[in-house]
A protein has these predicted regions:
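Glycine/proline-enriched, intrinsically flexible loops and inter-domain linkers
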Residues: 2-170
């Protein structure tokens, strides 16, 4: 599906990625495997800081995004597997830490939109299948559906005011 690629997928990028795919035709492909050619392509201002903190990156829509963080003394590299990979326990520790404390997420690579005006709520109510947040400051996970009822998109929707909503979608 060509919609998976944005303006970052230039002819030179596609040439390098095609060559990489051809060179790996007879190589075992693992779940969630990230190929290295033509990377990093797009980086957020915090990329170097995250890398220094142990980030192991993956590419999403041309953007380098931290998939997980290697603790001190652990190599910053993925070891792919059909079972649990080397990062499994580390991600579990990250989730536990964020659940019990707090976390910070680089949102540079995700789509963001503000829908505002007197018809904003009616528009979004028609667009998504879930209930919109009623109180200012509340957040809801909402889904836009296809004509056949499948999920087309997922949004985190925050009500900013009576007539304004902020949407985030990865």
């Amino acid at each position: 599906d060509p919609r998976r690629y944005g303006s970052y997928a230039t002819k030179s990028y596609l040439k390098v990625k095609n060559e990489e795919a051809y060179a790996n035709v007879f190589v075992t492909h693992f779940p969630d495997e990230e190929r290295t050619e033509a990377r990093p392509l797009r980086t957020a201002p915090c990329y170097d800081r995250l890398k220094a903190l142990g980030a192991v990156f993956g590419q999403k829509f041309g953007w380098e995004r931290a998939n997980w963080f290697a603790p001190e003394g652990v190599p910053q590299e993925d070891h792919w597997s059909f079972r649990r990979s080397n990062y499994f326990a580390h991600i579990g520790n990250e989730v536990r830490n964020v659940t019990e404390n707090a976390g910070l997420l680089d949102m540079s690579a995700v789509a963001k939109a503000r829908i505002s005006g007197p018809g904003a709520e009616a528009f979004l109510d028609h667009l998504v299948a879930n209930k919109l947040p009623k109180k200012v400051g509340l957040v809801a996970l909402c889904h836009a559906l296809t004509e056949r009822g499948g999920v087309h998109s997922e949004f985190t929707v925050q009500r900013e005011s009576v007539t304004s909503f902020y949407l985030v979608s990865a």
